[in-house]
Amino acid sequence: MKQQQEQVLRSVAQEDIRLIRLWFTDVAGVLKSVSIDPGELEEAFSEGIGFDGSSIEGLTRVYESDMLLRPDAGTFQRLHTKDGTDVHGRMFCDVLTPDGLPSPADPRGALERAVQRASEMGFSVFAHPEIEFYLLRQPVDINHLEPVDQAGYFDHVTRGLSNDFRRKIVRALEE
């Protein structure tokens, strides 16, 4: 077992983490999650956790549905429940075929292979997520949402709720 995996197992035991969430994405980038008991984690590291890949959009065909999730210990994070009473662990996973090979349909694996190919060609790849959101007024009716102002994408707004909120976000990110 790798050192990072052993460290995760120790952290889970010492911090009384009672649930492990295994995260991966479908081909559209939509986050998916499988939850396991901490007692299954050592086997997940060594063998992977089986799941039906045909249930995930674009991952595999029905007759090739058996897939494996293998957690990447380097992505381990603690997640606190909303009320702060419980701590879960989460890790992103590699999606593998039943014989333990990387699935060609795994977006994370595809990115890793593309970065490796670019590196072999002498390029450096820099990637990051783009976080977007909408600022809406508290809805009276969930079917009729209203923005806090009429500013559009990239509009320069010097006053108002959206400008104040963006300023608070920037300050929080700088801390």
Q: Which role does the model predict for each range below?
A:
Residues 1-175:
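Glycine-rich, acidic/polar active-site loops that bind/position phosphate-bearing ligands
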